[in-house]
């Protein structure tokens, strides 16, 4: 586990979308990837608990794969390839519904976990967490782990 995932310090990456945009631009300038790397954000919500468990990205190909397979399939902006959620961890998700926002520039996927959590981090009991397991203190900007 990295320092970023366990830290109580707030270290937000406000350049993430800039990096993603540059990656898309560079890929297109180089002749394009097998599939267009243009992406939009996807909020992923647990159908049963209503928790937002992840915010990630999809491109058109990943979205269509998700819809066809009824599974959570995303686009990895760090690896620039399809991300079959749970392919290595076994933490897969059934895709139950999909919604688009008013400007049609982001999606909401309603999913049901097939086993448990979604995040690569684990709590003290060894169970996978959801990605939003740290709460920000408004005064100090310190993080508190709500699922230690």
PLM regions: where:
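C-terminal binding/interaction regions
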Residues: 2-39, 46-148
């Amino acid at each position: 586990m990295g320092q970023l995932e366990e830290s109580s310090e707030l270290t937000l990456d406000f350049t993430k979308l800039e990096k993603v945009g540059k990656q898309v631009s560079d890929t297109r300038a180089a002749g394009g990837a097998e599939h267009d790397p243009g992406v939009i954000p996807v909020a992923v919500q647990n159908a049963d608990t209503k928790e937002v468990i992840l915010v990630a990205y999809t491109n058109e190909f990943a979205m269509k794969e998700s819809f066809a397979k009824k599974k959570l399939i995303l686009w990895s902006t760090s690896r620039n390839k399809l991300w079959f959620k749970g392919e290595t961890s076994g933490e897969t998700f059934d895709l139950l519904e999909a919604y688009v926002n008013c400007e049609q520039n982001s999606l909401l996927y309603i999913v049901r976990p097939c086993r448990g959590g979604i995040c690569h981090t684990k709590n003290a009991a060894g169970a996978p967490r959801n990605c939003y397991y740290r709460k920000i203190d408004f005064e100090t900007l310190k993080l508190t782990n709500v699922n230690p």
